[in-house]
Amino acid sequence: MRTNKVIHVIGVHAEGEVGDVIVGGVSPPPGDTLWEQSRFIASDETLRNFVLNEPRGGVFRHVNLLVPPKDPRAQMGFIIMEPADTPPMSGSNSICVSTAILDSGIISMQEPLTHMVLEAPGGVIEVTAECANGKAERINVLNVASFVTRLAAALEVEGLGTLTVDTAYGGDSFVIVDAIGLGFSLKPDEARELAELGMKITAAANEQLGFVHPCNADWNHISFCQMTTPITRENGILTGKSAVAIRPGKIDRSPTGTGCSARLAVMHARGEIGIGETYIGRSIIDSEFKCHIDSLTEIGGLSAIRPVISGRAWITGVSQLMLDPTDPWPSGYQLSDTWPAI
């Protein structure tokens, strides 16, 4: 076999959402901080294009690059590459990364609990992995500070009129809207329409409401539209379903850890949930994250929470991505039949 490069990948999904992990073949990018390293990857695009574009990837795929941490508290760093963004944090991807590094032995597993500190571009997270029989069975992530920026804001969306929305940050930035009011019940056969409408709402929210992280002015847009059903109690436990539209136009298969964190911040701001109370976030395929508020904090003068996201991930395979020197598409390609135009 002829190849100009070999990238070693562990395939993983967390509650349905693909979050593959690069474990070899890629040098750490330049930058004094993980955020700077992630900005290099975002602007350079070489690695993103190679692993995310067809024929090696697709719009369904997220890929994480393991890097040495910059924060001395952390044992490992990771940079998240989503189809269109290189975000500060991702709940499902942090669960994929934690599972991959424990199940593969990159970090030694301790049963029944393994405690780790990982560094994402958006900050340090604490992980407690529930382990048995050589498998990380459940990953509990103490997420970064999550906060509300707007409650019950008016948003004009062409074809929909005036919507009432919330905006919040849970490791990434969200506009949150009632799905029932839009005529959806959040079923798999609604995914295409949800994705298209979500992109439309996100664009309107960026134009009219905007977002700037109080401690990181580089993150200055709303990334996702989270369409939600009302909170109910199932067997006494607060439960809610959501579908998160991810750029350039797909629906998260998992319950979206950063989305659950943002929703917890909104719920707490409204007095709907207390510290330590369990909330189950459910996805469009009915997978679940178990979440709760660990503590209250403050960030950039804003009241915030530290949420915990709990979910499962599974190894799907091990692969090597290669580039034949005669391949006419070294950066891959995107077609609008599966990769919607932003």
UniProtKB/Swiss-Prot annotation:
InterPro entries the UniProt entry points to: Pro_racemase_fam
Name this protein carries in UniProt: Trans-3-hydroxy-L-proline dehydratase
Family (UniProt): Belongs to the proline racemase family.
Keyword Lyase assigned: yes
Cross-referenced Gene3D superfamilies: Diaminopimelate Epimerase, Chain A, domain 1
Functional description taken from the UniProt entry: Catalyzes the dehydration of trans-3-hydroxy-L-proline (t3LHyp) to Delta(1)-pyrroline-2-carboxylate (Pyr2C). Is likely involved in a degradation pathway that converts t3LHyp to L-proline. Displays neither proline racemase activity nor 4-hydroxyproline 2-epimerase activity.
EC number(s) reported in the record: 4.2.1.77
A matching Pfam family: Pro_racemase
Reactions mediated catalytically: trans-3-hydroxy-L-proline = 1-pyrroline-2-carboxylate + H2O
Residues where substrate binds: 91-92, 252, 257-258
Taxon lineage: Bacteria, Pseudomonadati, Pseudomonadota, Alphaproteobacteria, Hyphomicrobiales
GO terms of molecular function: 4-hydroxyproline epimerase activity; trans-L-3-hydroxyproline dehydratase activity
